[in-house]
């Protein structure tokens, strides 16, 4: 049968062989054709180097298969190239080879176009025109191959030490793949890595797109330390943060981990355990803090204060503000926390809609005041609700809102429980389960609110 032998220069040789021929026989045929001594030949098939004593049929080499011929150069050397999948490729090179040559050899072995290859050695990306000796790459050195993916993207991974790693990924990569890439770059075993995005720990089997991680997103890397332990930190808002620590960590270290997770500067953090405020220079073991202990975090505000923002869904957000903050600033903080664009936010306090240019102190909003957040819905509309006292309330609604939703909005604005509200439109009492569009209620329609008094009829 015929087989083909392709050299690194791109030349293809055709050989007549039998399935029972040994690799040694094949090398002798190549020597006959090309004059290359067998001891300088290495034959590769399906990514495997072929051994002299084995036959073509041992390797399932059939007619018209293509082998790759790599020359074992006198005065040359072997180097290794490790891919992000953990596969290691062996290359025959000379110190005078350029990075471009090396990429061509990788293409020959693996089929990866040079323009998709990035080679890393000692943490440095290697430039095409430089040679291996320029980078002091010696025999049996290991290079790392990162694919510059078409349709790929870059993301950043920030460690607790503040170091930022750049990774080439695709949206379809699993978290497991990402951890393998981090291992490749940093040497940290995947089982010691915890990746956090938007406050959530990422699960190995899920993909980046599952978590809506897009190009240039930043993940946070927390090490799950062997011999380490987990502790919990509870904030005044009731949120619980999980930290990976060691008993030898100082309180200062713990505050740095909290900053990394929550963005709260250490100088604004006070940590309490067993009723004691913890001092920066002491360790967790000094205070006998053991695995799964819970610390309490109190935020020491710079001349600031906490306020609460309650949404129509009943969720309460805690914000750190100053009395001099404008309503615009407050909306920006809400956007940071909740992702709601300021132009969709309406803030209500004491029944008044707050104007962007005014400050909290203008409205006498003090510490621990509660604002109400109403969304100004795109594709939404305003309607009016008139009470028997003659007061008119403005609501932001959508035609698909149920009467129940509308009553919840009225409760949010006016504090009147839904079960005390009766809404009338066009002389009809409106039923909870129906929508505004069911009743043909359009923008700027006026509903009438009648109170159903407790104990009344």
Swiss-Prot record:
Propeptide, residue positions: 457
CDD domains noted in UniProt: Ubl_ubiquitin
Extra remark: For the sake of clarity sequence features are annotated only for the first chain, and are not repeated for each of the following chains.
Sequence ranges assigned to domain Ubiquitin-like in this UniProt record: 1-76, 77-152, 153-228, 229-304, 305-380, 381-456
Organism placement in taxonomy: Eukaryota, Metazoa, Porifera, Demospongiae, Heteroscleromorpha
Cross-link Glycyl lysine isopeptide (Gly-Lys) (interchain with K-? in acceptor proteins), sequence positions: 76
Organism: Geodia cydonium
Protein's cellular compartments: Cytoplasm; Nucleus
Keywords assigned by UniProt, alphabetized: Cytoplasm, Isopeptide bond, Nucleus, Repeat, Ubl conjugation
Family statement: Belongs to the ubiquitin family.
GO cellular component: cytoplasm; nucleus
Full protein name: Polyubiquitin
PANTHER family attached to this UniProt entry: UBIQUITIN
């Amino acid at each position: 049968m015929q087989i083909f032998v392709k050299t690194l220069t791109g030349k293809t040789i055709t050989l007549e062989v039998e399935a029972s021929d040994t690799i040694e026989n094949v090398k002798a045929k190549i020597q006959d054709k090309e004059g290359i001594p067998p001891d300088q030949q290495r034959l590769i098939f399906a990514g495997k180097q072929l051994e002299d004593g084995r036959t073509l049929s041992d390797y399932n080499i059939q007619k018209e298969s293509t082998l790759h011929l790599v020359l074992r150069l006198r005065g040359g050397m072997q180097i290794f190239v490790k891919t992000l999948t953990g596969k290691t490729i062996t290359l025959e090179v000379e110190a005078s080879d350029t990075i471009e040559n090396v990429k061509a050899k990788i293409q020959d072995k693996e089929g990866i176009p040079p323009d998709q290859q990035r080679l890393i050695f000692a943490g440095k990306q290697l430039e095409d025109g430089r040679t291996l000796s320029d980078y002091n790459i010696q025999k049996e050195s290991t290079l790392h191959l990162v694919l510059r993916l078409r349709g790929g993207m870059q993301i950043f991974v920030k460690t607790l030490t503040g170091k930022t790693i750049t990774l080439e990924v695709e949206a379809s990569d699993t978290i497991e793949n990402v951890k393998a890439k981090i291992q490749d770059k940093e040497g940290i075993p995947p089982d010691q890595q915890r990746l956090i995005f938007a406050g959530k720990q990422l699960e190995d089997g899920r993909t980046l797109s599952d978590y809506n991680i897009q190009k240039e997103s930043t993940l946070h890397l927390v090490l799950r330390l062997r011999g380490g332990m987990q502790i919990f930190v509870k904030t005044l808002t009731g949120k619980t943060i999980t930290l990976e620590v060691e008993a030898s960590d100082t309180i200062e270290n713990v505050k740095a981990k909290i900053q990394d997770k929550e963005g709260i500067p250490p100088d604004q953090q006070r940590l309490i355990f067993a009723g004691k405020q913890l001092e920066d220079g002491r360790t967790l073991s000094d205070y006998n803090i053991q695995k799964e202990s819970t610390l309490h975090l109190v935020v020491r505000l710079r001349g600031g204060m906490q306020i609460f923002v309650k949404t129509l869904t009943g969720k309460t957000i805690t914000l750190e503000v100053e009395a001099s903050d404008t309503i615009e600033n407050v909306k920006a903080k809400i956007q940071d926390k909740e992702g709601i664009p300021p132009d969709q936010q309406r803030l209500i306090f004491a029944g008044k809609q707050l104007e962007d240019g005014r400050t909290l102190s203008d409205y006498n909003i003090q510490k621990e005041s509660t604002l109400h957040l109403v969304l100004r819905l795109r594709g939404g509309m305003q309607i009016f609700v008139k009470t028997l006292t003659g007061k008119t309330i403005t609501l932001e609604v959508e035609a698909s809102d149920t009467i129940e939703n509308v009553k919840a909005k009225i409760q949010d604005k006016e504090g009147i429980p839904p079960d005390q509200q009766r809404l009338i439109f066009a002389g009809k009492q409106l039923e909870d389960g129906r929508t505004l569009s069911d009743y043909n209620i359009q923008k700027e329609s006026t509903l009438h609110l009648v109170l159903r008094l407790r104990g009344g009829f």
